[in-house]
């Protein structure tokens, strides 16, 4: 009886525990036939011939090949799983790698950047200068508009002239001529004529008017003075 050198278990037809694909396939068909016939028929009244041995061998070889493929696939899967378990990129990437790079809870001190500091300090100073310049530019037209719209707050450079002309207007409307000292201290208008009392004819008529002496001339002179006063206030 020939023993297969590559079989791990010796095939014994009388012992079912030794039935294995590798042990049966390790025998040649002739050796298998001799082994089966020597140990007795597996079925009563039936002897194993070459056809049975060939079928057994073919089935054994196919089963052995299938078992080898299964083992190969299992070993491949096992090796892949072991490689995945022992691969440092598989285990360290979600733990050390992510903690080292993407964990927001870890706050690291960063050195100060001079360009960022200059960029931050620059805009804090410039808007103050531009704001003061804008305020000064806006205050001047506002003061001019305010002084031109309301006669109660005239600009400082036209205070004396406007006050003197207001005195002329008040004295002309009331019928009394202003005093000589007040006329000398104030600025006389350039286009109008000195006021005259109501009911008293003027000695010299205005050079620009051809109307006779009377109320119309007085009214025109008063309106001219008031117009000069309004012009002085608008300046």
From Swiss-Prot:
Q: Which Gene Ontology terms describe the biological processes this protein takes part in?
A: viral process
**Where do the segments described as Disordered lie?**
104-235
Task: Indicate where this protein is primarily found.
Answer: virion
Q: Where in the cell is it found?
A: Virion; Host nucleus
Q: Compositional bias (Low complexity) spans?
A: 158-188
Q: Name one GO cellular component term.
A: host cell nucleus
Purpose of the protein:
Participates in the assembly of the infectious particles by decorating the outer surface of the capsid shell and thus forming a layer between the capsid and the tegument. Complexes composed of the capsid protein VP5 and VP26 assemble together in the host cytoplasm and are translocated to the nucleus, where they accumulate and participate in capsid assembly.
**Assembly, per entry:** Interacts with the major capsid protein/MCP.
UniProt-recorded name of the protein? Small capsomere-interacting protein
Q: Which organism is it from?
A: Varicella-zoster virus (strain Dumas) (HHV-3)
């Amino acid at each position: 009886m020939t023993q297969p050198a590559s079989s791990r278990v010796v095939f014994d037809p009388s012992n079912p525990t030794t039935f294995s694909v590798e042990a049966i396939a390790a025998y040649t068909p002739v050796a298998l036939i001799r082994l089966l016939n020597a140990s007795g028929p597996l079925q009563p009244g039936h002897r194993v011939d070459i056809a049975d041995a060939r079928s057994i061998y073919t089935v054994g070889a196919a089963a052995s090949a299938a078992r080898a493929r299964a083992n190969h696939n299992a070993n491949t899967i096992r090796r892949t799983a072991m490689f995945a378990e022992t691969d440092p990129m598989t285990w360290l990437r979600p733990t050390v790698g992510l903690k080292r790079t993407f964990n927001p809870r870890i706050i690291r001190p960063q050195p100060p950047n001079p360009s960022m500091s200059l960029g931050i300090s620059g805009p804090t100073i410039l808007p103050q200068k531009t704001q003061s310049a804008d305020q000064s530019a806006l205050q001047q037209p506002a003061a001019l508009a305010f002084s031109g719209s309301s006669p109660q707050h005239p600009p400082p450079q036209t205070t004396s002239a406007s006050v003197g002309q207001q005195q002329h207007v008040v004295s002309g409307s009331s019928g009394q001529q202003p005093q000589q000292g007040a006329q000398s201290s104030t600025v006389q208008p350039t286009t109008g004529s000195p006021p005259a009392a109501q009911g008293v004819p003027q000695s010299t008529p205005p050079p620009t008017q051809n109307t006779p002496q009377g109320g119309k001339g007085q009214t025109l002179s008063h309106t001219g003075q008031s117009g000069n006063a309004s012009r002085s206030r608008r300046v």
